């Protein structure tokens, strides 16, 4: 995104923001972004519930298979023809109370061995349920990926639309690389974080609830022992994440600053090499790269402690349950298969708890990126567009007591008034920072004036839409801009519906045809953003041809010939005289030779017109303009 010429310089970039302003608020706002995908989200949750429920039931089924095997082994060792009660009484009579307690809690038939058919049916059912759960989890993952992709496409679109609604004053205070990092890196990181966390979050919470219900159904005491570890895990997680979250914010902020430095260095690499600043650029790169490393390492190191810490706490609960459960089996309070199922449930319970702690790492990084993206979406936009369109113009432009300041208290334009009659050429000259370019930026409504009015044919430009206004004005900037495409496509950027003949006509008027005809591919020669193999002057000619093709009713030339050689400049001046006919034109240039034929010349200093007249009149006054011609 290229700011208009004369935009106020940016301040030095601040150090990385080390605090997340509202983690849970940003996370909630992120969840709301999923609302348009309600059907997909409901399908994801439904599949998650079904898959989790099946996965939780299977350990209980496997516990039943264990009971079948154990009952058969014990039953085979007992004499046949007696009941279980008689076998228990016989064991107590022998003084073997431990075996009697164990036997009383079992569903055993004395003299009967293992029912392998029942075991096979039970295991087959468990296998079928495992396969069904796996398919549901797979389908859930695919639908979740689709949900996240659609949400991110919408978010990227919203950010892109927002950028086009932002005033240019926003870009004055932003490095392009930093903004690009928000639109690309941060959204990519957000997408990755959502894909990693949402599925696990839904599945983990459902698993914990379902597993807890199954554990309570087996043994309330063992379930209580397991739950005692949860508050401790949450306290440890909170203590760690409170220290790691600011580092995630700093990491992505530092990444944006690094991208901004690279964008500035690479786009101006010729200047960097010309003035021998490679060492300084490398040193600055290493400083910013080290900032990214330090913040990233600290964030990952701290957040990486969460999972092992919660796993350790979970293992403490596992040991306690193993001891208490063994005692309950020995006393016949629960069966061996039940304690086996309970131990599996502990693993299932601790795993999502550990995953929740671990995914908080990715969630912190994602929310840090989300805050940076939401910052762009929350920026104040340009003032609302009025509906009326600008009528056909004769071209009278009037500034009435216009005042403007980029920053409050620092006026750039002071009580400026001027009139440009239809078809006239108005040249604006003055030292750097005098406010020349600011005048045309105000005419284009790139910025809103502080007070006063700007009228075109008596219509206040603030009362018509910006698009209607800008479609009537052709503007050639000092900094040329080409996009990756052919020369013909770059010229047609001024009016995409133009025919080939119209493109060639505009190119001929700007003398682009003189060098295009020497190229093997002619108008189909591809050029890149930096111009590729064509010269700076040739780039300037292409942008001028683009403006001519747009058929503007007003023309603004900002340093339009300052980057071309003398011969090309003479050709352009000759073409300009013809193209300016019947168009009100504003020319800004430091080369006074380009404005000798202007109808009116305005000499601007510190935002005020200090002299006005044509070339001969101003020379005769021997004032500021005269001194400029002598310099």
Swiss-Prot record:
GO MF, one example: ABC-type transporter activity
CDD domains cross-referenced by the UniProt entry: ABC_6TM_Tm288_like (cd18547), ABCC_Glucan_exporter_like (cd03254)
Sequence segments annotated as region (Disordered): 1-20
Major location category of this protein: membrane
Transmembrane segments: 42-62, 123-143, 205-225
Domain ABC transporter span(s) in chain numbering: 397-631
Domain called ABC transmembrane type-1: residue spans: 42-365
GO CC annotation: plasma membrane
UniProt cross-references to Gene3D superfamilies, sorted A to Z: ABC transporter type 1, transmembrane domain, P-loop containing nucleotide triphosphate hydrolases
Keywords: ATP-binding, Cell inner membrane, Cell membrane, Membrane, Nucleotide-binding, Translocase, Transmembrane, Transmembrane helix, Transport
Topology in the lipid bilayer: Multi-pass membrane protein
Coiled-coil stretches: none
Keyword presence, ATP-binding: yes
Location relative to the cell: Cell inner membrane
Gene Ontology BP annotations: transmembrane transport
Domain topic, free-text comment: The ATP-binding domain (NBD) and the transmembrane domain (TMD) are fused.
Protein known as: Fatty acid ABC transporter ATP-binding/permease protein
Organism per entry: Mycobacterium tuberculosis (strain ATCC 25618 / H37Rv)
